[in-house]
Each structure stands twice: as C-alpha cells, then as structure tokens.
Amino acid sequence: MIVGIGVDVVDIERFGRQLERTPGLRDRLFVPAERELNTRSLAARFAAKEAVAKVLGAPAGMNWQDCWIGLDHNGPTVQVKGTVLAVAEAKGVKRWHLSISHDGGIATATVLAEG
C-alpha cells in the first residue's frame, strides 16, 4: 500500500549560494557523511529530504539530520531515525523508494513511501 508520494526540485546554483551565505546550514541539514559532497549532490539530497518531509506531512520539529540519503548497489536510499522515524512509523511506512537526478541546473527527487 502506498502511504505517500513526495516530489521536490532545487535550483543547484541558488542552493550553493545559500550554503555559502549561511555558514551553519550545511551542518544543520546534512549528516557528516553527506557534508563533503559537491553542491550538485547536496542539492539532490536536500530535494530528497524535502520530498520525504512532504510524504510525512512536513512534521513540526523534524530534525533534518534524522533523514539522510545513502547509497547501495541499487542506487540512493532513504535512511531515517529519531523524529523522522517516529512519524514514519506512526504513518505505517515500512519501505522507502527514491529517485534523484540533477540536470540543467536543477536537482529533483521523488520519494514513495510504502506501508
């Protein structure tokens, strides 16, 4: 059963400027393993996190570091803990599906939550 679908797009150049202007933003939005990635990859991961938030109804108090984007042999994966895991479990999410892409200066992500 599909619990929800979320989609988000991020302008890569604009996102890069935001990271430069706001020194703590990278640390607030990303786990240590993500922080060293290039701006294009960070924008795609942020789009994925936003898509996860949309699936969950953009819960108040969501900690951005409680959701991170990993990689396995099949591609990108959604990983959750803490605040995000609690809301996902309450909504019955058992499995995440994620597609991310970046082209033409835009990063996009689509997340499907399955229960």
From Swiss-Prot:
Record-listed Mg(2+) binding positions: D8, E50
Coiled coil: none
Catalytic activity: apo-[ACP] + CoA = holo-[ACP] + adenosine 3',5'-bisphosphate + H(+)
Residues annotated as signal peptide: none
GO molecular function, one term: magnesium ion binding
Cofactor(s) listed: Mg(2+)
Record keywords: Cytoplasm, Fatty acid biosynthesis, Fatty acid metabolism, Lipid biosynthesis, Lipid metabolism, Magnesium, Metal-binding, Transferase
Subcellular location: Cytoplasm
EC supergroup of this enzyme: transferase
The keyword Lipid biosynthesis belongs to this UniProt entry's keyword annotation: yes
Keyword field contains Lipid biosynthesis: yes
Catalytic activity, EC: 2.7.8.7
Primary location class: cytoplasm
Transmembrane segment boundaries: none
Pfam families from the UniProt entry: ACPS
GO biological process, one term: fatty acid biosynthetic process
One GO CC term on file: cytoplasm
Top-rank lineage group of the source organism: Bacteria
Assigned protein family: Belongs to the P-Pant transferase superfamily. AcpS family.
Biological role stated in the UniProt entry: Transfers the 4'-phosphopantetheine moiety from coenzyme A to a Ser of acyl-carrier-protein.
Descriptive protein name: Holo-[acyl-carrier-protein] synthase
Organism field: Pseudarthrobacter chlorophenolicus (strain ATCC 700700 / DSM 12829 / CIP 107037 / JCM 12360 / KCTC 9906 / NCIMB 13794 / A6) (Arthrobacter chlorophenolicus)
Source species taxonomy: Bacteria, Bacillati, Actinomycetota, Actinomycetes, Micrococcales
